[in-house]
């Protein structure tokens, strides 16, 4: 009985801690651009305008300045929260 209670508590603890952690991964190239577009502007429709307006391009700099989303999320893994912080 005591062993099964401890086992259940360990399993519940592992399940809970797994949900609390966001996975960090790398975003490079078109995957980075598409993910940023989804986070900042909603779903990107293919077949529409080929280029984003100038004011949208400036929004990619966001509040993070010139530090660089590529430096932070392509060269090193980052979370979606970090990536979303680049939205203007």
Curated annotation (Swiss-Prot):
Molecular function per GO: growth factor activity; hormone activity
Proregion span(s): 47-65
A family per Pfam: Insulin
Signal sequence, start to end: 1-18
Disulfide links within the chain: 28-74, 40-87, 73-78
Transmembrane region(s): none
Domain of life: Eukaryota
GO CC terms, sorted: extracellular space
UniProt cross-references to Gene3D superfamilies, sorted A to Z: Insulin-like
SUPFAM superfamilies referenced in this protein's UniProt entry, alphabetically: Insulin-like
Keywords: Cleavage on pair of basic residues, Disulfide bond, Hormone, Secreted, Signal
Subcellular location: Secreted
Main location group: secreted
Function: Brain peptide responsible for activation of prothoracic glands to produce ecdysone in insects.
PANTHER family: INSULIN-LIKE GROWTH FACTOR II
Assembly and interaction partners: Heterodimer of a B chain and an A chain linked by two disulfide bonds.
Family the UniProt entry places it in: Belongs to the insulin family.
More info: Silk worm has two kinds of PTTH: 4K-PTTH and 22K-PTTH; there are many forms of 4K-PTTH.
Name by which UniProt lists this protein: Bombyxin B-8
Species of provenance: Bombyx mori (Silk moth)
Gene name tied to this protein: BBXB8
């Amino acid at each position: 009985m005591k062993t099964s209670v401890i086992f259940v508590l360990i399993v519940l603890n592992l399940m809970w801690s797994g949900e609390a952690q966001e996975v960090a991964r790398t975003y490079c190239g078109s995957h980075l651009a598409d993910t940023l577009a989804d986070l900042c502007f909603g779903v990107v429709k293919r077949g529409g305008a080929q280029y984003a307006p100038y004011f949208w391009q400036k929004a990619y700099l966001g509040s993070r300045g010139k530090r660089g989303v590529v430096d932070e999320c392509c060269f090193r893994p980052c979370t979606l929260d970090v990536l979303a912080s680049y939205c203007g």
